[in-house]
Curated annotation (Swiss-Prot):
<protein>
    <recommendedName>
        <fullName>HTH-type transcriptional repressor NanR</fullName>
    </recommendedName>
</protein>
<dbReference type="InterPro" id="IPR023730">
    <property type="entry name" value="Tscrpt_reg_NanR"/>
</dbReference>
<dbReference type="GO" id="GO:0045892">
    <property type="term" value="P:negative regulation of DNA-templated transcription"/>
</dbReference>
<dbReference type="InterPro" id="IPR008920">
    <property type="entry name" value="TF_FadR/GntR_C"/>
</dbReference>
<dbReference type="InterPro" id="IPR036388">
    <property type="entry name" value="WH-like_DNA-bd_sf"/>
</dbReference>
<dbReference type="GO" id="GO:0003677">
    <property type="term" value="F:DNA binding"/>
</dbReference>
<feature type="domain" description="HTH gntR-type">
    <location>
        <begin position="30"/>
        <end position="98"/>
    </location>
</feature>
<keyword id="KW-0678">Repressor</keyword>
<dbReference type="Pfam" id="PF00392">
    <property type="entry name" value="GntR"/>
</dbReference>
<dbReference type="GO" id="GO:0003700">
    <property type="term" value="F:DNA-binding transcription factor activity"/>
</dbReference>
<dbReference type="Pfam" id="PF07729">
    <property type="entry name" value="FCD"/>
</dbReference>
<dbReference type="InterPro" id="IPR036390">
    <property type="entry name" value="WH_DNA-bd_sf"/>
</dbReference>
<keyword id="KW-0805">Transcription regulation</keyword>
<feature type="region of interest" description="Disordered">
    <location>
        <begin position="1"/>
        <end position="22"/>
    </location>
</feature>
<comment type="similarity">
    <text>Belongs to the NanR family.</text>
</comment>
<comment type="function">
    <text>Transcriptional repressor that controls expression of the genes required for the catabolism of sialic acids.</text>
</comment>
<keyword id="KW-0238">DNA-binding</keyword>
């Protein structure tokens, strides 16, 4: 296949500088595992191996690409992270279709890095506001009685968790998850789950007592959201949702400032 020669280094010591500040230097050679990964990925995308079909064994891949076992295993692990193969102990890798969760998961590291920069949290909170605003309007216009009942059940669990902060956070996430499920789009679900995971992970540690009032306020705001959806009033549902998320954002911003002052 010519894989081994795909990125031969060609250092030309006499090559001119590029611009005023860049000196000539050889391009870094790709690792063998990366080259194997790219070749296998192209074969999968060309449907040379169909969904559900097993790839050749590690030994066969080693011989085919003329590389060692570590390179093959690293390549397969990278394909697994991309959702292109599944690997079970004792079995050959099997071709799979990337899920929405896998696609969003690939962005997780970059998202967490972005959140750590100044303004990062505010940008993600704005993204959540725009995203959930569309979800709640859709819910008010299209939610079935069964879906509204699921929201009501999530709200009931919310009310039962007011005095337990860890349980309330879980019930809060579940309430918004039920809302995100209403359109029936798996990509929406993956984005929503990731957004909340990233934002919650970036929140400061706060004493339990300080959270009790916040929990009660959030619960009352959830009631307003469900009431508007039940009445099939998208404008009121949107106002209730935006009021809720803006309140949550302001509260956690205040918690963060208080935490920083104590350091």
């Amino acid at each position: 296949m010519g894989l081994m020669n795909a990125f031969d280094s060609q250092t030309e010591d006499s090559s001119p500088a590029i611009g005023r500040n860049l000196r000539s230097r050889p391009l870094a050679r790709k690792k063998l595992s990366e080259m194997v990964e790219e070749e296998l990925e192209q074969m999968i995308r060309r449907r040379e191996f169909g969904e559900g079909e097993q790839l050749p064994s590690e030994r066969e891949l080693m011989a085919f690409f003329n590389v060692g076992r570590p390179s093959v295993r690293e390549a397969l692990a990278a394909l697994k992270r991309k959702g292109l193969v599944q690997i079970n102990n004792g079995e050959r890798a099997r071709v799979s279709r990337p899920s929405a969760d896998t696609i969003i998961g690939e962005l997780s590291g970059m998202a967490k890095d972005f959140l750590s920069h100044p303004g990062g949290i505010a940008h993600f909170e704005q993204l959540r506001l725009f995203f959930e605003s569309s979800l709640v309007r859709y819910a008010a216009e299209h939610a079935t009685d069964e879906q509204i009942d699921l929201l009501a059940k999530a709200l009931e669990i919310n009310s039962q968790s007011l005095d337990n902060n860890a349980a309330f956070i879980r019930s809060d996430v579940d309430f918004h998850r039920v809302l995100a499920e209403i359109p029936g789009n798996p990509i929406f679900m993956a984005i929503h789950v990731a957004l909340l995971d990233w934002l919650i992970a970036a929140r400061p540690t706060v004493a339990d007592q300080a959270l009790h009032e916040h929990n009660n306020v959030s619960y009352q705001q959830h009631i307003a959201i469900v009431d508007a959806i039940r009445r099939h009033d998208p404008d009121e549902a949107d106002r209730a949702l935006q009021s809720h998320l803006n309140s949550v954002s302001a509260t956690w911003h205040a918690f963060g400032q208080s935490t920083n002052k104590k350091k």
